[in-house]
């Protein structure tokens, strides 16, 4: 094995999967492997195009002795390209939200989620190793036909989480009131209304 390459549906700042692939790339490189991140060109944030490559234009980068890790999270052209790439294959499943949560709210997102779930089923038997970032997700991808998924918890850069708090912001919330912090996207499946109730 000379390289461990990762494939993601999109690459951005502040996104959990993008953050994880950055940490994993640094880890793979520290172990002595070449490692690149690939995505669809249109789904790579323009200012990050130096960090990630367009998969469709870079298929020649892959060799039979490489490991190719697909982060499976939504419908994408990269999911269709993955099985045809040379190299040993692995999938890390991050969950694909049921599209029903987005029907009538964000139809384009619902379509991508539906496509992703269909692609996840079609990818069964395409990888030697299948992982998921939680037991729930492992059970879900197993139900889609993937054999023996293992749990690999989210890989984090803990140094980034040790930032000093902003004293100005802390003062704003020292008013004796109860404060609730929601960390996540405001999206139908996150059920923020349950938190507010």
Where do the protein language model's features map onto the residues?
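Nucleotide-activated donor-dependent transferases that construct or modify glycoconjugates
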Residues: 1-13
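Donor nucleotide-sugar binding/catalytic pocket of nucleotide-sugar-dependent glycosyltransferases
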Residues: 110, 121-167, 174
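A structural motif in glycosyltransferase catalytic domains
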Residues: 20-21, 180, 194-196
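Short hydrophobic "strand-cap" motifs at the C-terminus of beta-strands
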Residues: 7-8, 133, 155, 182-184
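Active-site helix-initiating loop/hinge in glycosyltransferases
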Residues: 16, 188-197
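Conserved donor-binding/catalytic core segment of Leloir-type glycosyltransferases
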Residues: 131, 171-190
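Short amphipathic alpha-helix
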Residues: 17-28
């Amino acid at each position: 094995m000379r390289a461990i390459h990762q494939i993601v549906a999109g690459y951005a700042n502040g996104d959990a999967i993008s953050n994880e692939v950055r940490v994993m790339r640094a880890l793979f490189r520290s172990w002595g492997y070449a490692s690149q991140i690939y995505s669809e060109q249109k789904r790579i944030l323009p200012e990050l195009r130096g960090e990630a490559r367009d998969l469709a234009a870079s298929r020649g980068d892959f060799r039979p002795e490489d490991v190719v890790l697909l982060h499976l999270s939504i419908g994408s052209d990269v999911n269709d390209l993955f099985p045809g790439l040379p190299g040993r294959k692995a999938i890390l499943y991050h969950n694909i939200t049921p599209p029903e949560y987005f029907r009538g709210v964000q139809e384009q997102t619902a379509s991508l989620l539906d496509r992703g779930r269909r692609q996840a089923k079609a990818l069964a038997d395409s990888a030697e190793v299948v992982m998921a970032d939680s037991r729930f997700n492992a059970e879900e991808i197993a139900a889609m036909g993937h054999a023996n998924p293992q749990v690999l918890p989210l890989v984090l850069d803990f140094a980034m989480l040790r930032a000093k708090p902003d004293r100005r912001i802390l003062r704003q919330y020292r008013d004796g009131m109860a404060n609730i912090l929601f960390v996540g996207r405001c999206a139908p499946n996150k059920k923020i209304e349950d938190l507010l109730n």
